Amino acid sequence: MIVDNSKDFDLKSFLANLTTHSGVYRMLDKHGEIIYVGKAKNLKNRVNSYFSKGAKDSKTLMMVEQIARIEITITPSDYEAYLLENNLIKQHRPKYNILFKDDKSYPYLVISRDKFPRVSFYRGKSAYKKGQCFGPYVSISSVKNTLNTIQKIFPIRQCENSYYKSRVRPCLQYQIKRCLAPCVGLVSQQQYDEQLAILKKFLAGKFSSVLEEISAKMYQASEDMEYEKAQVYRDQLVVLRKLQQQQIVDIQEDKTFDVIGIYMQDSYASIALLQIQNGDVVADRHWSIDAKGQDKTSIMHAFLSHFYLGDEIRNIWPKNIILSKVEFADITDLMNSISQKIGQAINWIIAPAADNLKWLKLAEVNARQKLNIYTSSKSQYQKRLESLKEFLELEKDIKRIECFDISHFQGEATIASCVVYTDDGEDRKSHRRYNIKDIKSGDDYAAIHQAVSRRVSSGLEADNLPDVMIIDGGKGQIHQAEAVFREYGIQDKVQIVSLGKGVERISGKEKIYKGFDDTEYTLDEHNPGFLLLRQVRDSAHDHAIKGQRKKVSANRQSSIIEEIEGVGPKRRKALMMYFGGWQELSRASVDEIAKVKGISKKLAQEIWECFH
């Protein structure tokens, strides 16, 4: 339950009446923004400690000065408090919490929940919504190689559902014995499920068990004189034994380790996670963070909560976790919560010896190397930000940059892209595209005006306008942005700047214009601020081009059908519902198209001819 929702917050009264139960507390500033989330076994003691006398680091003192309100949520146990704390930190990303950002979104193999499931791969945490997950895999290439291997051994379908549902005869995969063709009923549910069960064991690393099971099925089929079936199992064994010779081995759970190394330097920290199976590193992952005012134990605590209490998907959890040396007493409660969530006991090793020590040293060396790369890149980026701030004569540091670019195809399918850079670098999740409507063909000025107007309108409402807005273009384009700023009265809130190639159109010789200033500026092509302008502009250009190409492709496919007399919106929708997409429709035969409700044989012939 939320204890405090009042606007007039009385801190003294709040602290005096706090509960001693376990729970989560949220610190809010005067704008109502959550600036810190924490958990406690005893909320009264923990929250009061922030306001009591005693030594506190500068970061905590700065945070306490900004607290305008506190909210708490009581939880049934310490375990639920850890889970809620972790979810709230990921949701709100408070500025005084230690925040982790994966260096990439890892791929997983997924077995879908269909009656006849398909095996495919997806990136990131959305994978678990699709079905049963296996992974994560180190790279896209590794997961694709596994898919290829699976297809050679287990004839489980990999096709999209839209393609699967549209089949009236087996596809090529069936002919080359890489699919059982459940789409046209050539395999029973029991036979398909048997293959699926063996595949799941294979993906879980139970290699010997898979070999034994297939061998038993082969001999049983032979005894029953089902020789074709026995041959299928024999072929599977041949491929599996070849893999065995390539040193694919069983995963023994007591020999699975997660090794977590931390390296700290100045106000930065890097965490390296090595996943070990049977003496081999099967995956390595890294996180680099700003860690001002934090020690190794607090960083380890935050990381363990982030990684093990979050939505990480793994079919094999480690029996052993090796950690860089930290204060054990400070993380024992968290360790118990992690074991409870995973559903198994974990052997926590904080002072490893012998063989285990070499893994920890390897993780710490990896963490150090990644931190060196991170700090070097961050230093260069900060120099560019500082240089741009100086050129634009800004008083405050630049926290957010947005850049607009327009792309169209021969005046049609106009797209405006907006890319976002923060003081931490490119923020891909915040990139946006705008479909530009109701303007004359090829009118870039009107497109810029519309896109900037829509962005400013939403930005004022959400209170998230950028510090700097870059417009790709020259005087004409920046004048359109200026007009929007005048309409909304924000001339002094956001610095506009445009970057155009000028008459010569030579890269590195771009002309620069500042908002409400007709002076034409040029900067040395090696100037850090100029390099940042070009970097952001090029990113916006690429983002616009990709969006515009998608739109052109969709428009072209749709227009093919629209030209056929008798195919209106309802029939177009029926075709898409049946086939799942234009690509599947283009592959369909006349008879297959005629199966769609409302499509006659004659109309099906006309539709087929459009694609052939």
From Swiss-Prot:
Keyword field contains DNA damage: yes
GO cellular component, one term: cytoplasm
Domain UVR per the UniProt entry, residue ranges: 208-243
InterPro entries (alphabetical): GIY-YIG_endonuc, GIY-YIG_endonuc_sf, GIY-YIG_UvrC_Cho, RuvA_2-like, UVR_dom, UVR_dom_sf, UvrABC_protein_C, UvrC
Gene3D superfamilies: 5' to 3' exonuclease, C-terminal subdomain, GIY-YIG endonuclease, UVR domain, UvrC, RNAse H endonuclease domain
GO molecular function: DNA binding; excinuclease ABC activity
Domain GIY-YIG: 20-98
Keyword check for Cytoplasm: yes
UniProt-annotated location(s): Cytoplasm
Disulfide bonds: none
Pfam families: GIY-YIG, HHH_5, UVR, UvrC_RNaseH, UvrC_RNaseH_dom
GO aspect biological process, one term: nucleotide-excision repair
SMART domains membership: GIYc
Main subcellular location: cytoplasm
NCBIfam families for the chain: uvrC
Subunit structure: Interacts with UvrB in an incision complex.
The family this protein is said to belong to: Belongs to the UvrC family.
Function: The UvrABC repair system catalyzes the recognition and processing of DNA lesions. UvrC both incises the 5' and 3' sides of the lesion. The N-terminal half is responsible for the 3' incision and the C-terminal half is responsible for the 5' incision.
Name the record gives this protein: UvrABC system protein C
Species name: Francisella tularensis subsp. tularensis (strain WY96-3418)
High-level lineage: Bacteria, Pseudomonadati, Pseudomonadota, Gammaproteobacteria, Thiotrichales
